[in-house]
């Protein structure tokens, strides 16, 4: 199926008016994703509203503040990027950002790296094939990012252990969630205390076309993350903090 363009109301709902070059890049990204998805099982959200709402809108709706200061150079990392979201959408929307896309599955990172190159983003988008627990202990990455994001990766305490060690002390982690209840905050806040971090905001948004409610958790460090985190590969998911 050919790439499509959303109606103007889509951008109004998102609260962001991309340049024509950015619109062209997002449309090109849809075509690239469709093509690569025939070879590598990246995602089912590639056509029509599945792509524009389920991928682009869902990636960018939490970034209202960041989109208003899009020319500010920042270092971002997308953990568990899968088919490249939200990382590739963020790289297009924030033209001064340096974005690292991380996934442990080599077939996915190869596809995402090729898409970034085709989009002309290779100078700002780096791709890394590695388990996040390893990256979080690498001195070249630990404590290096202004923003760390993850969408649909694991339970919130697990994701926090993945993201917080990557942050600068004035950085912020963005945890994309589907549903979120007050009861979820109890184990999550216990985990954050161990990581020397705090929950600063819970945002929520109804997606267009009745595509469900999404939540975003914004987390900030209280100081450097204790060096014991992240724990060994597999331990965060097997034995979540705060449980």
UniProtKB/Swiss-Prot annotation:
InterPro entries: rRNA_ssu_MeTfrase_G, SAM-dependent_MTases_sf. One of its GO terms (cellular component) is cytosol. S-adenosyl-L-methionine binds at residues 80, 85, 132-133, 151. Keywords: Cytoplasm, Methyltransferase, rRNA processing, S-adenosyl-L-methionine, Transferase. GO terms for molecular function: rRNA (guanine-N7-)-methyltransferase activity. Its EC number is 2.1.1.-. SUPFAM superfamilies: S-adenosyl-L-methionine-dependent methyltransferases (SSF53335). It comes from the Bacteria. Residues 211-243 are annotated as: Disordered. PANTHER family: S-ADENOSYL-L-METHIONINE-DEPENDENT METHYLTRANSFERASES SUPERFAMILY PROTEIN. This is Ribosomal RNA small subunit methyltransferase G. It comes from Synechococcus sp. (strain CC9605). The lineage of its organism: Bacteria, Bacillati, Cyanobacteriota, Cyanophyceae, Synechococcales. The gene is rsmG.
């Amino acid at each position: 199926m050919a790439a499509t363009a959303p109606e103007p109301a889509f951008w109004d709902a998102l609260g962001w008016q991309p340049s024509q070059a950015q619109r062209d890049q997002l449309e090109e990204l849809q075509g690239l994703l469709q093509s690569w998805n025939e070879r590598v099982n990246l995602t089912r959200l590639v056509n029509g509203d599945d792509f524009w709402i389920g991928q682009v809108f869902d990636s960018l709706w939490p970034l209202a503040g960041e989109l208003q200061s899009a020319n500010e150079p920042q270092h971002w990392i997308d953990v568990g990027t899968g088919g490249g979201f939200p990382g590739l959408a963020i790289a297009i929307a924030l033209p001064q950002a340096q974005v690292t896309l991380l996934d442990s599955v080599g077939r996915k990172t190869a596809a995402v790296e090729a898409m970034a190159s085709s989009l002309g983003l290779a100078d700002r988008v780096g791709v890394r094939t590695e388990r996040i627990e390893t990256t979080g202990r690498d001195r070249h990455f630990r404590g290096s990012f202004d923003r760390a994001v993850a969408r649909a990766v694991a339970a919130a305490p697990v994701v926090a252990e993945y993201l917080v060690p990557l942050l600068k002390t004035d950085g912020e982690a963005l945890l994309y969630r589907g549903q979120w209840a007050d009861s979820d905050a109890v184990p999550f806040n216990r985990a954050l205390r161990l990581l020397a971090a705090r929950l600063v905001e819970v945002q929520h948004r109804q997606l267009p076309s009745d595509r469900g409610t999404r939540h975003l958790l914004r987390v900030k460090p209280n100081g450097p993350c204790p060096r014991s985190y992240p724990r060994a590969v597999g331990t965060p998911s097997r034995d979540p903090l705060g449980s």
